[in-house]
UniProtKB/Swiss-Prot annotation:
Entry keywords, A to Z: Membrane, Vacuole
Keyword Protease included in the entry's annotation: no
Domain DEP: 1317-1392
One of the GO BP terms on file: intracellular signal transduction
UniProt feature, compositional bias: Polar residues: 16-29, 668-679, 907-920
Subcellular location: Vacuole membrane
Protein's recorded name: Vacuolar membrane-associated protein iml1
Chain spans, region Disordered: 1-47, 646-689, 720-810, 822-960, 1407-1456, 1774-1830
Principal subcellular localisation of the protein: membrane
Topology in membrane: Peripheral membrane protein
Length: 1830
């Protein structure tokens, strides 16, 4: 059970008070958030509810319970029994159990149907929530609803007393029992309409367009109930999980037009990011004492996995550890693996040199293996910190100062970095990386899992400091791809709004300043941070003078803009935050386990929690109990609403001139103050004991004008008076507060007591506070030599008379003491001072430069700096201001300060701080002291008069661009109503039935992520749409002349298809008030998006939105649809400038099997490729002539499959005496017949095809060859017709209609003449493996010829029967005399008595050039005009990398073009379960080598994915009966995987011993068999792959001749290396140009195998020893279908044999490890020099083709078995030659042929007709050769 039980109830009680009130009360919060537009109100309060019906009163009746044998109807209702009530068909009736009447406060009466009484029941029964099992005990929640239907007449006749009956499943859900007494009454649809319905599904891929169709078909205007099973089109299955009415969970509800469906996937892909920041190794001092990582590994993750297991979820899990490491500048210069070049993108104004690290722990592992996942995580955690903190120094010679090079010196690795804090981590980059593969979501579509969820686990508190560019890029990417993030924080929740991103806007124009010196120099991060905030916070001060005078040697070439360096705060709508509290869930777990000592829920009064200060400052943590009790750490109020860029205001004003005088050089600080620094946080202010504390702060200079100093002294005396006087001032009325000067000279502050701040709050909270105030002095102020803006509230009372202050040592203080309420918190004692081991150095040095008054304090807290901005009127004398290095701790203000009037063109802001919880330990040097003072100019909030309001004023184009997705707020004073605003959640608004609570873990989202809702209310106003968007209109109309295309025929169907297409691409249907206003001219009301009829009327308007793009579809007259695209003008502002359209991100990545981190440059493209919607809409409408490759142009969904030949069991091999190859080909032939049978034919064409049924033939026309496609193309290049127009023609030549034959009137001799004539069957010399068969034909062609040329033969079966009779009469015979006549790739020869002498042999499978009909010059002499068949394969040649040229040069100098695959339209819905055509493009090979993979590719645009999955599942089941395994593989090659999936990379294996020179291959043709070719440079690598049971998948482009343009129906092949696949389908391999082997796990097959948990383990295959694999052979997906749906199970089990080591076949439990097991065997073999040497010798002594598949060996034609398909080795009519050339170690050894032939005959253990004899060369050989030499 979920832990939600006891915790949820308290959550429910918080929300249910309003929602269970009378329906006449104000609209509930939830309804106002999520319900539909104003014209269609979704709550009963806004509708006209029928309060009186003729039959509204409740009626008592007896309920029956029936099963499916009684009736399939869920509810049977006899209207005759209730005739007096006026109930009619279509009314909604509720069934209420009688027990509710006894529990309620009112007794049942005849008129209990009124809503007020019904709700009184709800309220009176609210106490039932106390029961742990009473979730649905109120009548509102537990009632059963149904729509009245007429009772079937037969049931009414047989059971006249039946009043009401429900099925057993309904009775179980609602607690009904047979013969129960229930009460029935009519209810209004408005009163029982559900606001949200949660729908869950698993083990299937469902696109959002299918969800929309499911709702329209199965849910709209119907009653839904919890646990209801939904079946759509007999294939898509889903379950109703929850139903909400006005925020309450109920058992049943009415699905109204305004109900929002929320789909959740229980088989999703989860990417878990664990931020390994510095805090992850911090100890939990207040809890168990463990480090925070223990909370992850022992708390959160086990809880998450248990909840997955309890809900039977089947997710795929990827876990990545990530962190950002900060380096010392001194380590960057050393020669290391992290060179300065690789650190080029990590310098910025706020950070030290950093590098981002990613460690992939597991990738796409099934969630059921959670123990393995945790073990891997623990293992990687042990070494993670060591790996990322050390730099390995290169062994390269180090250049000396004199230029000479020293000898190589191996230097050890050094610890050069440390992880950054969570605040400054690389969280946005990690999220962007995880979502980057979604840009290719349409390629290699996983048909089992739906949805991707990213969970980020951070030790922080939900505050992150990011760059604007990263925030904008990530926001755009997530918005475009429709994905949301779950953030789980391990630290306690702060008291401000979260999640929070703080960022600085980029400059309006490129800056050319020399600020890079600060960025790249030796300054500390804190100093650079302060530098960045200097100039913009002194707008009236010359930036040049300020920087140059304060820091000599640093100049600015150009002025900084005012805006860019100010902090802004935003909350993204795509981030859902949770806080993990182990104590809470530990208590909940005790309750669920019925612990007798656990407290009873809701019966124990909770003790008031004492505020515990979350302090990380070392000095405070080390204080004793008495010290901390006696200390008064007082908290002044936060400043808010103050603008730092306004003009002068009454009070202090200093001119820039007064701060520009140069000073003396500074000296070192004296050491005696260093010891006093740690005392700065103790109660006694030690500066009181100094003789003249002012001298510590202001060191006098001779050039300092006395007027300024004296004025400041007088001002200090007035402002910082002794404590009693100041306290008295605090008691003055609040109205005096605005008149006090808003200048905070923090150098003179001291502590105030808790009592004083309490008094302060009492007075300040009394009376209303004006929103706008004018600041004036409240006491006489001396004549100011300068003026300054008011920038801070009144200072708290001082505890002593000291006018100086010791600087605080804190580097970063979080002021997260403020909740979301506008009422100031009453905490008195402590603040959160989060500083890690902050140190300070005391000194009496003075700064030589004049500074602002603000610089008097060294308090540089990143959280609570107060800033003063100064300006100088003309004529003000200059006075250098000198500073001390030490001031006492200054209290923190957390009360909202009064807002000041803002000037025009200046934003209204308040001061804020960085929400840092920790900070880097940095020594205080001369420069850092200055930086610390300047850092006091704290960040500013993006605040308006309505904080957090979306409609608030936007201050810059950058903020405006981010505004819809990242809301700029004041995190410390965000009104509750703003957080409750449903528009806060953006595109995910409709996924929340109730406003989520931040403090709890969102288990629902973590267990089953919600898919992007179908609807949204995010929409601009009419004015914004007209002024801020660019419009692009066009019109679409259905194509009346589609010519066989499955195009819609009506406007309504076209509109639905266009909406479906947009939904599948991430668009949402817009509903709400704004849409009604905008579309007023076309429609008077918001359309019912689930009503198909309403969408078809003239003028119907539908708006869809996705990010910044909006589409409007209008049904106009003339059967047309007008489409208007709206594109936001600021889209270009949101995206930063990119290189080649994307951002290049450099990071150190370590994938699963990689031993070290490798630097990778990753292109992060946030913008999706511009989709041509005009083309797409017209393509849907049937206009398709203008697209040359629609699959790529319109981003079709694409998947690729391969049929892998498996080793067969003996009982299958003995079937009809067919050998393994023949059985495989039979399987492909069987599949082709299925494809032909379900080929899509438009309805109008079917009428014409019915009369021509006998004319149809198998259009696939696959040509089978025993050579790889590249070899066939190279051999036949001189005979290929350039355009190859005859490939699609029928191999049989039709006779004229008048010459058609009849079986009864034909003789054998005449038939023999016709068959061998010009209009007969093609006769040619055909080669199969190494034997050439002369003048033969194949059975498939003769079958087709007979079918088309005989009037009385109508089916292929009749043709086969007739052909068998001809064969029995001796017209022809099988070349091996083994088979009777068959329809397939079987070779037959005309008998000698009927054979006609032929002048030539037609032996090319390509259309022959008539001038070249002589003897073929290449070995492919067994080809015909038949079409080539390598359709979908990417690369099928393992053979020879160098291209083999034909014997005779080609006479054609033009580049030949050949198509190696063909496509067809395939109907995946032959049973017509869908209301539309369900068609896919099926691409298949036309040239196939039986020992290689047969390739298929499916592409579709708007087809139901579940139907495609079911279709492929049936193919897999059929193929496995014939020893073929259907496996999904990636479309791209293995070496390119990291371009689309950044967390994956092929594993490179190098041979420890370089292979020797490969032997030269020998080619054969009918004339010569001794022609030598170029040696294959990868001969031994291919043999090695064959040894480890790999077969060829796809050939590289370079394997084909350079003068041949090879293309496929799906596009041009682009493989760099040839690719091979393991027979298990779990591992891909490629051989690089250097001879290395790249290995990559095929996770597409593993996901499907893992889902087939219920498929039993299969017995191992019983094979003779000579068929055993030599190396470890794993078949983890043993006889499992490529889809993991258990619907269809294979009939036969074609498993790989056990390895010699005895490893059993892998089941689904360890399927994830299958690729690693195979890889480990290969690595071990390649690392063993002795085994490699032995392998090289054996390969040379036993020459065989290096193909993964059959290859021509060094044999004569006469010594090769004559096979129709691969057949037994038998004698041939051609005598063997005397000797056989063989490649020995030196390529010169010859072996007598008689010995070889004796080995060939040694096949007694094999079935007759085996294609190969003797032991296999390897498990991969798949019968590569008939002989085994040596």
């Amino acid at each position: 059970m979920s832990l939600r039980g006891p915790m949820k109830r308290s959550h429910l009680r918080q929300v249910s008070a309003a929602s269970l009130d009378s329906l006449s009360t104000s609209r509930s919060l939830e309804a106002s958030h999520h319900d539909a537009p104003s014209d269609h109100p979704s709550t009963p309060d806004e509708r006209a509810i029928r309060l009186s019906f003729p039959g509204l009163e409740r009626r008592q009746c007896t309920l029956w319970v029936h099963d499916e044998t009684f009736s399939r109807e869920e509810i049977l209702f006899n209207q005759t029994a209730f005739s007096d009530t006026g109930v009619s068909a279509g009314d909604v009736v509720e069934i209420l159990h009688a027990r509710h009447t006894a529990d309620g406060a009112h007794s049942l009466k005849a008129d209990l149907g009124s809503k007020s009484l019904r709700d009184s029941h709800a309220k009176s029964s609210s106490t039932l929530h106390l029961d742990a099992l009473s979730k649905f005990k109120t009548p509102l929640q537990s009632r059963c609803l149904f729509v009245v239907k007429p009772l079937p007449q037969d049931i009414k006749t047989r059971h006249p007393k039946l009043e009401l009956s429900v099925t057993t499943s309904i009775a179980n859900i609602f607690g009904f029992k047979n013969r129960d007494t229930v009460y029935v009454s009519i209810v209004d649809r408005a009163q029982c309409s559900a606001s949200h319905v949660d729908i869950a599904f698993r083990d299937q891929y469902v696109v959002r367009s299918d969800m929309w169709r499911l709702v329209m078909s199965e849910l709209a205007d119907k009653i839904v109930y919890k646990g209801q099973k939904i079946v759509f089109m007999g294939s898509i299955k889903a379950t109703v999980k929850n139903i909400f009415i006005r925020g309450e969970k109920v058992l049943s509800g009415y699905f109204s037009p305004q109900t929002i469906p929320v789909f959740r996937s229980e088989s999703a892909k989860y990417v878990l990011f664990i931020q390994m920041s510095r805090e992850m190794w911090d100890f939990d001092s207040e809890g168990t004492g463990d480090i925070l990582f223990s909370r992850v590994i022992n708390g959160f993750l086990p809880e998450l996995f248990k909840r997955w297991a309890n809900s039977d979820a089947r997710h795929l899990v990827t876990i990545v550890l990530f962190t950002r490491v900060e380096y010392d500048a001194s380590t960057i210069g050393m020669s290391s693996t992290l060179s300065p070049e690789s650190l080029k993108n990590i310098f910025n104004s706020n950070h030290a040199p950093t590098r981002d690290f990613y460690r992939v722990v597991v990738n796409d592992m099934a969630s059921g293996h959670w123990t393995t996942i945790l073990d891997e995580l623990k293992k990687d955690f042990r070494t993670f910190l060591r790996d990322v903190s050390t730099l390995k120094v290169d062994d390269a010679p180090v250049a000396k100062a004199n230029g000479s090079a020293s000898a190589p010196n191996a230097r050890p690795a050094v610890i050069a970095g440390r992880p950054s804090t969570a605040l400054r981590g690389n969280i946005l980059e990690a999220i962007h990386l995880a979502s980057s593969h979604l840009a290719y979501d349409h390629i290699d579509r996983d048909m089992v899992h739906t949805g991707t969820s990213i969970i980020v686990i951070t030790p922080g508190s939900g505050v992150f400091e990011v760059s604007y560019e990263s925030l904008a890029s990530t926001t755009e990417a997530l918005t475009n791809r429709g994905i949301a993030i779950d953030l789980v924080c391990l630290s306690p929740m702060p008291l401000h709004s979260v999640p929070l991103f703080k960022y600085r806007e980029p400059p309006r124009r490129p800056s050319t300043s020399s600020f890079g010196d600060i960025q790249h120099g030796g300054y500390s991060p804190e100093m650079r941070h302060s530098f960045a905030s200097l100039a913009n916070r002194t707008p009236h001060l010359s930036p040049k003078s300020a920087i140059q005078d304060s820091f000599p040697g640093i100049g600015l070439r150009d002025s900084w803009s005012t805006r860019p360096q100010e902090w802004n705060y935003g909350i993204p709508h795509w981030l859902d935050i949770s806080y993990w509290n182990p104590d809470t869930y530990r208590e909940a777990r005790r309750i669920l386990k019925n612990d007798p000592n656990a407290p009873i829920p809701f019966t124990v009064t909770k003790r008031s929690k004492i505020f515990v200060p979350r302090v990380r400052m070392y000095e405070i943590q080390m204080m004793g109990v008495m010290e901390s009790e006696q200390s008064n750490i007082s908290i002044p109020y936060l400043l808010e609403g103050q603008s730092l860029s306004r003009g002068p205001s009454p009070g202090l004003s200093l001119s820039p001139a007064s701060l520009a005088a140069p000073g003396k050089p500074s000296s070192r600080r004296s050491s005696n103050f260093r010891h006093q620094l740690s005392d700065s946080l103790r109660p006694e202010p030690f500066l009181q004991n100094m003789e003249n504390p002012k001298d510590v702060i202001l060191a006098k200079s001779k050039k300092t004008p006395n007027s300024v100093l004296s004025w400041m002294d007088k001002y200090d005396e007035k402002v910082f008076q002794p404590f009693p006087k100041q306290r008295q001032r605090r008691r003055s009325p609040k109205q005096k507060r605005p008149s006090e000067p808003n200048v905070q000279v923090s150098g003179a502050h001291d502590r105030i007591s808790a009592r004083s701040i309490s008094h302060l709050r009492q007075h300040e909270t009394s009376g209303p506070r004006p929103a706008v105030r004018k600041v004036e002095p409240s006491f006489p102020t001396p004549k100011s030599p300068s003026s300054a803006k008011s920038a801070s509230p009144k200072k708290p009372a001082l505890k002593t008379k000291s006018t100086t202050k010791v600087p605080r040592i804190s580097r970063t203080i979080s002021f997260a003491l403020r909740g979301l309420s506008s009422t100031p918190p009453r905490a008195v004692a402590s603040t959160e001072v989060n500083v890690e081991h902050a140190t300070g150095k005391s000194s009496t040095d003075t700064f030589p430069d004049s500074k602002s008054v603000d610089s008097l304090s060294v308090s540089d807290s990143a959280s609570t700096r107060t800033v003063i901005e100064v300006s100088k009127p003309p004529g003000t004398p200059q006075k250098p201001v000198q500073s001390s290095a030490i001031t006492p701790s200054r209290p923190i203000s957390i009360r909202p300060a009064p807002k000041l009037p803002e000037e025009p063109e200046q934003p209204n802001r308040s001061l804020a701080a960085s929400f840092s919880t920790t900070a880097t330990e940095i020594p205080l040097t001369e420069d850092t002291r200055s930086a610390a003072q300047l850092r006091k100019r704290g960040p500013k909030f993006e605040v308006t008069m309505d904080p957090g309001s979306r409609d608030g004023q936007i201050k810059s184009p950058q903020s405006k661009a981010l505004a819809p997705w990242v809301r700029s707020i004041n995190p410390c004073n965000t009104p509750r109503e703003v957080l409750r605003d449903t528009t806060w959640f953006g595109r995910w608004q409709h996924a929340y039935p109730r406003p989520p609570h931040v403090a709890v873990v969102k288990w629902k989202s973590l267990k089953s992520p919600a898919i992007l809702p179908l609807t949204t209310e995010e929409f601009p106003t009419a004015t914004e749409l007209a002024t801020e968007y660019l419009q692009t209109p066009y019109r679409v109309f259905p194509n009346d002349d589609t010519e066989g295309v499955e195009a819609p025929k009506t406007r309504g169907v076209l509109l639905r298809e266009m909406i479906s297409l947009r939904l599948s691409h991430g668009f949402q249907i817009v509903v709400g008030k704004n849409v009604v206003e905008v579309s007023g001219q076309y429609s008077l009301q918001s359309p019912n998006v689930f009503d198909t009829k309403g969408l078809e009327r003239d003028g119907a308007t539908v708006f869809l939105s996705k990010g910044k793009s909006i589409h409007r579809l209008i049904c106009v007259e003339g059967a047309e649809i007008e489409v208007t695209r709206f594109t936001h003008r600021s889209s270009s502002v949101l995206s930063p400038e990119r290189t080649n359209g994307c951002t290049v991100y450099t990071a150190a990545m370590r994938t699963i099997l990689n031993p070290v981190y490798e630097i990778k440059e990753i292109k992060l493209d946030s913008t999706t490729e511009e989709y041509n919607w005009n083309y797409a809409d017209n393509y849907v409408a049937g206009h398709r002539d203008y697209l040359y490759n629609p699959a790529q142009q319109l981003q079709f969904w694409r998947v690729r499959y391969v049929l892998i030949p498996m080793h067969l069991r003996r009982n299958i091999q003995s079937f009809n005496e067919d050998n393994e190859e023949e059985i495989h080909l039979l399987g492909i032939d069987h599949l082709t017949h299925i494809w032909q049978r379900h080929k899509y034919v438009p309805p109008e064409e079917k009428r014409f095809d019915t009369s021509n049924k006998k004319r149809e033939q198998n259009p696939l026309n696959i040509m089978y060859q025993t050579r790889n496609p590249s070899e066939v193309v190279a051999a036949e290049l001189d005979r290929i017709l350039l355009t190859d127009p005859g490939l699609d023609s029928s191999p049989a030549q039709l006779l004229p209609e008048s010459e058609l034959l009849e079986r009864s009137s034909i003789s054998l001799s005449s038939l023999a003449q016709i068959i061998q004539g010009d209009n007969g069957v093609r006769m040619m010399d055909r080669r199969w493996h190494w034997r050439l068969h002369y003048n033969c034909f194949i059975g498939f062609e003769l079958t087709t010829w007979l079918l088309q040329n005989f009037r009385d033969i109508d089916t292929r079966e009749e043709a086969v029967e007739f052909g068998d009779q001809l064969m029995k009469h001796g017209l022809f015979q099988h070349v091996e005399k083994r088979h009777n006549f068959r329809d397939g790739n079987y070779f037959y020869q005309i008998s000698s008595e009927y054979r006609v002498a032929r002048p030539e042999s037609r032996n090319s499978w390509f259309p022959q050039i008539r001038t070249e009909k002589s003897t073929p010059s290449t070995p492919a002499g067994d080809h015909s005009k038949e079409s080539p068949v390598v359709g979908h394969a990417r690369s099928d040649s393992v053979d020879d990398t160098p291209v083999q040229t034909p014997t005779t040069p080609s006479k054609s100098k033009n580049k030949a073009t050949i198509m190696l695959s063909k496509s067809m339209k395939y109907d995946v819905d032959p049973r017509k379960r869908s209301n539309r055509p369900e068609v896919v493009d099926l691409h298949y090979d036309r040239l196939h080598n039986p020992d290689n993979c047969f390739h298929l590719e499916l592409s579709w645009m708007n087809t139901t994915a579940k139907l495609i999955e079911d279709t492929v599942l049936s193919w897999a089941s059929t193929a496995e009966k014939f020893g073929l395994k259907l496996v999904q593989v990636p479309i791209a090659e293995a070496c390119a995987i990291d371009q689309t999936q950044p967390f994956r990379k092929p594993y490179r294996v190098q041979l420890k011993v370089p292979p020797p020179k490969a032997p030269a291959p020998t080619f054969f043709n009918p004339v010569s068999f001794a022609q030598q070719g170029a040696p294959d440079q990868h001969y031994f690598q291919k043999a090695l792959l064959r040894k480890f049971d790999f077969v060829l998948d796809f050939e590289a482009r370079s394997a084909f001749p350079a003068d041949v343009e090879v293309s496929y129906s799906w596009g041009i092949p682009d493989y760099r290396y040839s690719q091979y696949i393991h027979r298990s389908g779990s591992l891909l391999a490629q051989i690089t140009d250097e001879g290395d082997i790249l290995l990559l796990a095929n996770r597409l097959v593993s996901t499907r195998s893992a889902a087939s948990r219920d498929i039993p383990r299969h017995e191992r295959m019983d094979r003779p020893d000579q068929y055993r694999a030599r190396a470890a052979t794993y078949d983890p997906g043993d006889r499992m279908s490529p889809r993991l749906s258990p619907v269809a199970r294979p009939v036969h089990d074609m498993a790989s044999p056990l390895s010699p080591q005895g490893h059993p076949p892998l089941d689904s439990a360890n399927l994830y490890r299958a690729p690693e097991h195979i890889l480990s065997g290969i690595v071990e073999f390649c690392s063993d020099a002795e085994k490699l040497e032995q392998f090289y010798d054996e390969s040379l002594a036993r020459p065989a083709s290096t193909k993964v598949g059959p290859a021509p060996a060094t044999l004569m034609d006469s010594s090769i078995p004559s096979l129709e398909l691969p057949a037994s080795v038998v004698s041939h009519h051609i005598s063997p030659p005397p000797i056989l050339p063989s490649r020995g170690p030196q390529g010169s050894t010859t072996v007598p042929s008689v010995d070889l032939r004796s080995q060939v005959r040694d096949d007694s253990a094999l079935p007759r007709g085996s294609p190969r004899a003797g032991p296999r060369a390897s498990p991969l050989s798949s019968g590569l050769r008939p002989l085994r030499l040596g």
